[in-house]
Amino acid sequence: MKQNVFEVLMYLFENYLYNDEEPGDRDSLESELHEAGFSAMEIRKAFEWLDALADSRVLPAAPSGKSSIRLFGEPELARLDTETRGFILYLEQVGILTAESRELVLDRILALDDHEVDLDTVKWVILMVLFNRPGEEEAYNWMENLMFDVPTHLVH
């Protein structure tokens, strides 16, 4: 039996959100997830995670200065290694993440019950957050290209 909230989120994202397939009602989705092998507790946590992400769409944007520096707290340091923290800050520096979307990404990462989160998981959380935020289509497309484009090799 699968026991990871992130796996439930990935299943939903790949089968419904990312493929533009219309999901059924919540009860039918829960039944499908049970049939796919997910536990009731993980399904509930995944829906809570998605509800919190959806609720964040209505929060007003807070002004942020370009010269501000983000210091990570203990819970973030415990779950994110140097590479993942650097990647998040890099995306903010190049304009893919705003200060608001960065904070939402960090909030959603901490909401996963995983002890330590790897770079691939962080990339998927970023993609899910950008997908959910109105006006972030360009950033979403950039992030999607970063994740899925395979570089071509030149042959001489």
Swiss-Prot record:
- Name-wise, this protein is Protein Smg homolog
What gene is this protein translated from? smg
Hey, which family's this protein in? Belongs to the Smg family.
Signal peptide limits: none
Q: Which Pfam families does the record match to this protein?
A: DUF494
Q: What InterPro entries does its record include?
A: Smg (IPR007456)
